[in-house]
């Protein structure tokens, strides 16, 4: 299970997740498609998925407890990426409304999002360091760094990095 902050009792999260319906996807099945709206959150029980955006893999997820579809659920919008299974995978399934109804699950998802923001911030710092170290001044890289800075600063977060989900 991903790191659960000390303010959430581990057993409380596990108990709530264990009550959610279980679904299984076979290898190479689409779990979410970008542009669709499912109103569901999936919590990986076992297996592996790839997350792709515009045909580019942005993550492989294998850690039990990882949450998928949380951005769509929290922002009440369509999924922003494609999620596809790499092997037979099991998920606990929750309606998006669970985030409004269950503060423990909401805090769990918030902690996961905070970890991901922390990772993205670290990636930006690393990229900026590489750009400065190698005196890379290409417009594309510069624009990418600037865009990441804008996105992250809009959250009010400090730029730090740590391993995550």
Over which residues does each language-model region extend?
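Cyclic nucleotide-binding regulatory module and flanking cytosolic helices
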Residues: 1-29
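Cyclic-nucleotide recognition modules
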Residues: 18, 59-118
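Conserved short histidine dyad/triad with adjacent acidic residue
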Residues: 21-36, 61-64
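Short beta-strand segments in beta-sandwich/barrel cores
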Residues: 30, 48-52, 90-91
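Glycine- and acidic-residue-biased ligand/ion/polar-headgroup-sensing regions
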Residues: 39-55, 64-66
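Structured alpha-helical
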Residues: 56, 123-126
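Heptad-repeat positions
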Residues: 117, 124, 131-134, 138
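Phosphate-/nucleic-acid-contacting segments
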Residues: 133-165
